[in-house]
């Protein structure tokens, strides 16, 4: 039998299928995703949960005229398949390949580039307002998960949508999870709604039955609508949304395409914003993902039979952080941990298992997490806030205003710093050195290897002011084990003493700098290699010492050049006479796409081979310039 999936070549092909063919298509898409992602890795569990819902949306909408905005966007794989991108899935999240998130440059059926949480309603509402002001006619649908509803931005947008009263469909994809199980009052509220699922089915059934009564049926429906407001407080499950000014429809079975089609048509007939509450099952159709959905959030390539990873690496920096936090939990009763819905991802799961009353998962609410930690610190506790670098950007004002301005002892464990690889622009942590370094009272550190991360965390918890420690995704570096001088505030570590060329490396770039140093030695140079440890405060004493017998200072960081470590060093030397030349190795002023970290470092010319070549060229230019000076 010919596969239905083979008929899907471009957007709107799904409209040619019968309902039974769509149901077969859903199973074929699941089979395809399970097989394909076992080779490439990717966000499996969330995508398996929205297959029927996505097909129903594609039967309802007309692409690219209508606009579908995905919150976060990691669950848009079925959408990509239905818009003609199935053949590219072998390249998913690889260098130059298919993105794991919606990308407007990839398809005109992708309405908005996403990657972070709780943004879809705001973006969709903006499209709605633009549509109406320009007198255009198309549908806008925003899909947001129940986990994303723990983020305050979603409520700001819902409030605005209710005020504007524009025709706008919002789908709440409720699978009871973000990455892990949701927390907080909204989660409890949605639990209550799920228990009342028959309400919408009953309401629609009564309305249809009344309309069939000759002559008086429509009048009875009108009367029912006029009186329902007095009783719906007792029975309606979505009262919170109704009270905000939105029409609530649901809960609806997110795996029943017939029911989904009916409720989408009903939403289209309504005036004003409509929220459709859809119940889905994360990982549906693949037993390992249903049992362990968090493990299959952003899965590495896996064995289909077991769901286990095809390869297991050495301990990561996150693993090291996890181990140290558990040890601190044993010894220091005032140490507490704060997570913004990323407990397993940041390595806090074991800490939470051992000390559940000292782990605070606040949901997808980075701004709240930081100010909450400020309050914990004021109350005499020692909070450690573990957040991915790209998500910490969302709380810049809170770090500056609520923590740094009051000089509070909050430790920021900044995970996934630098280039993270396959998730691309939205997830690289390339800006933290710049925005954290500009904040008064903030200390900024970066470890060269796994032992230094442990030492830095111990040092940070002892401080009486804010400290940020940034470390990368992936396996922790185990080289330079013998270089473990005690951590001193603002002091760097000289790994090799040389002359003429000094390489000042930050954090993960020390590993690269070690290879660069060896390459330069093979070319006849004797470079000095420095592990900076601190980006703020800088080791000014060391910088002055290096002036004496070095003509070229090369800084290396896995951060954007603008406002970063290198520019700070350049500013220091620029204010002094007879200073060495400074050259910066950093990420240029552009967003870095997805791909392997190795490929991306080469693209950015911050890998060891590229840096060696650049230093040799700079040194050659410097020598030519010296030769041209008049005697």
Regions found by a protein language model. Give the residues of each.
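N-terminal amphipathic, basic-rich helices that act as targeting or association modules
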Residues: 1-82, 246-248, 253-260, 277-280
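Long, well-ordered, tryptophan-enriched scaffold segments
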Residues: 5, 176-321
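Cofactor-binding active-site loop characterized by glycine-rich and histidine/acidic residues
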Residues: 43-164, 317, 334-335, 340, ...
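Non-catalytic terminal/interface segments that mediate subunit docking, oligomerization
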Residues: 67, 272, 280-393, 398-408, ...
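A glycine-rich helix N-cap at a beta->alpha junction
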Residues: 88-98, 163-177, 198-201, 404-416
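Structural signature of the thiamine diphosphate
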Residues: 220-288, 409-414, 433-482, 581, ...
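Glycine-/acidic-rich phosphate or pyrophosphate-binding loops and their flanking alpha/beta elements
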Residues: 262-265, 297-298, 316-331, 347-353, ...
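Peripheral docking tails and interdomain loops at the edges
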Residues: 301-302, 309-313, 421-423, 443, ...
């Amino acid at each position: 039998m010919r596969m239905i999936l083979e008929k899907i070549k471009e957007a709107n092909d799904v409209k040619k299928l019968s309902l039974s063919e769509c149901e077969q298509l859903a199973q074929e898409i699941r089979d395809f995703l399970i097989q394909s992602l076992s080779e490439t890795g990717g966000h499996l569990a969330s995508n398996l949960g929205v297959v029927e819902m996505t097909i129903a949306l594609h039967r309802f909408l007309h692409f690219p005229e209508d606009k579908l905005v995905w919150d976060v966007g990691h669950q848009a794989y079925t959408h990509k398949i239905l818009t003609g991108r199935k053949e590219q899935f072998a390249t998913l999240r690889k260098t130059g390949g298919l993105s794991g998130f919606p990308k407007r440059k990839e398809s005109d059926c992708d309405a908005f580039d996403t990657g972070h949480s709780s943004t879809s309603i705001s973006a969709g509402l903006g499209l709605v307002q633009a549509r109406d002001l320009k007198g255009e006619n198309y549908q806008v649908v925003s899909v947001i998960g129940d986990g994303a509803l723990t983020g305050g931005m979603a409520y700001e947008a819902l409030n605005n949508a209710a005020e504007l009263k524009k025709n706008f469909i919002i789908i709440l994809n409720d699978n009871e999870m973000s990455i892990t199980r949701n927390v907080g009052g909204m989660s409890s509220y949605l639990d209550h709604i799920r228990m009342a699922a028959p309400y919408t089915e009953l309401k629609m059934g009564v309305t249809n039955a009344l309309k069939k009564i000759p002559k008086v049926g429509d009048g009875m429906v009108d009367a029912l609508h006029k009186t329902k407001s007095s009783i719906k407080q007792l029975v309606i499950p979505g009262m919170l949304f109704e009270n905000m000014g939105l029409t609530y429809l649901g809960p609806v079975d997110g795996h029943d395409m017939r029911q989904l089609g009916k409720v989408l048509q009903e939403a289209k007939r309504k005036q004003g914003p409509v929220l459709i509450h859809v119940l889905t099952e994360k990982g549906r159709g693949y037993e390992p993902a249903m049992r362990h959905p968090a493990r299959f959030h952003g899965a590495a390539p896996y064995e289909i039979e077991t769901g286990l990873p095809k390869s297991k690496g050495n301990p990561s920096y996150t693993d090291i952080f996890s181990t140290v936090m558990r040890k601190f939990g044993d010894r220091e009763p005032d140490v507490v941990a704060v997570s913004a819905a990323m407990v397993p991802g940041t390595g806090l799961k074991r800490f939470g298992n051992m000390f559940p009353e000292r782990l605070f998962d606040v949901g997808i609410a980075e701004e709240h997490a930081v100010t909450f930690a400020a309050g914990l610190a004021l109350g005499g506790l020692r909070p450690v806030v573990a957040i991915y670098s790209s998500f910490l950007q969302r709380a810049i004002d809170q770090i500056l205003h609520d923590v740094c301005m009051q000089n509070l002892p909050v430790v920021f464990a900044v995970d996934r710093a630098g280039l993270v690889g396959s998730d691309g622009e939205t997830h690289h942590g390339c800006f933290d050195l710049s925005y954290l370094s500009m904040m008064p009272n903030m200390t900024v550190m970066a470890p060269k290897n796994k032992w230094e991360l442990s030492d830095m965390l111990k040092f940070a918890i002892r401080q009486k002011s804010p400290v940020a420690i940034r470390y990368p995704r992936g396996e922790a570096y185990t080289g330079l084990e013998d270089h473990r001088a005690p951590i001193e505030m603002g002091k760097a570590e000289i790994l090799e003493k040389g002359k003429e060329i000094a390489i000042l490396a930050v954090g993960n770039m020390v590993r690269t700098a070690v290879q660069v140093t060896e390459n330069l030695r093979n070319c006849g140079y004797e470079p000095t290699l420095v592990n900076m440890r601190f980006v703020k405060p800088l080791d000014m004493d060391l910088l002055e010492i290096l002036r004496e017998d070095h003509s070229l200072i090369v800084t290396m960081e896995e951060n954007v050049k603008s406002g970063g470590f290198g520019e700070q060093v350049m500013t220091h030397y620029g204010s002094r006479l007879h200073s060495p030349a400074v050259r910066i190795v950093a990420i240029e002023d552009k967003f870095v796409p997805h791909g392997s970290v190795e490929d991306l470092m080469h693209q950015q010319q911050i890998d060891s081979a590229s840096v060696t070549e650049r230093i040799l060229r700079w040194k050659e230019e410097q020598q030519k310039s010296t030769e041209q000076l008049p005697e």
